[in-house]
Amino acid sequence: MKKILLCMGLSALFAGCGGREKPLAEVVDEALARAERQVLLMAEKYSGREGRLPRTWENGEDVSSDSRWWCSGFFPGTLWYVYENSRDPRVLEYARMYTARVEREKYTTDNHDVGFMLYCSFGNGLRLTGDKSYEEVLLTGARSLATRFKPEVGLIRSWDHNRDKWQYPVIIDNMMNLELLLWAAGYSGDESFRKMAVSHADKTMEYHYRPDFSSWHVVSYDTVSGKPHIRQTHQGFSDDSAWSRGQAWGLYGYTCMFRLTGEERYLQQARRIAVFLLNHPNMPADGVPYWDFDSSEIPDTPRDASAAAIMASALIELSGFAEGAEADEYMAFAEKQIRSLASPEYTAPEGTNGDFILMHSTGAYPFSSEVDVPLTYADYYYLEALTRLKRRLQS
């Protein structure tokens, strides 16, 4: 396992003579151009593998999934972001092709990940093309997701496994699936979708967060009282630790909820989570978190580039809802993360890394699963962050 240094090399931070920092717009443009070349290599490689989607690259071998894996929508979504920036017809063709591979998940009712699967793929496709056929897929998917909402609990159930331990498990990742419900409410006029999303966000805010605004990974609820009976981790270092990607999911989720509802309480929650993250004593100097902020092995423990990418994308958006020094702080931290991720420390040379863009993500460290490898969702949120930053720089 490679050890990621606490500070980025000078080559990652500076360009040219005399240590002059490369202009941010140039960093973004170069990163997007590199990403397009790498993503096209991946798209070409998998084009003949019917129904398969890239998941990771481990021990020198491709690891793929079918559409049922929770990450299936991320590679199609990455293609849509590349297309948004390049308008390359080859990328558009691939984006449509890989998006179609996920369509059957509109009927998924046995997990909460239908939001990840469909909104990252069909949602971006609809936004960029206006393809009306994508609306039916998204609405059907939202109806499927809604079957996992239990009014007595007020939340969307995340998982169905480990029923001997959890009555009604909800993980912080689930905040990311609410955007699909809110889209469905706006599209269909059915306010029940919105009520579910708001209820889920409110109860998560009440029961998932500690006084310092870090979050537990898993909260299981009593199905009769609707109150938590277990708070613990599944992928973090310990039940009381701050698993880095989980903190990023929460930051992103509440920022998104404010954008879509205008409810001030969600903006305040996002700000509080940001304060926790940006001021954490174990946040590395380059802004790319360790896989868990409380790992006992810091600094000799893997980073999670996916957490940095999710954070950066969320902070860029959150900065648009803030003013003055607060907005500047969010943007400065996101810029640091983007510069780090775009550096040779984290961006793979073209044609390597299994054709993924970013290196050094961590999936589930406690299970020795996907440790210090590329991950499809790291690339997706990195492309989203680059796209958001490019828009901001052009505005």
Where are these regions (language model features)?
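Positively charged n-region of N-terminal signal peptides that target proteins for export
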Residues: 1-4
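C-terminal motif of bacterial Sec signal peptides marking the signal peptidase cleavage site
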Residues: 15-16
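Glycan-recognition and catalytic cores of secretory/periplasmic carbohydrate-active enzymes
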Residues: 20-395
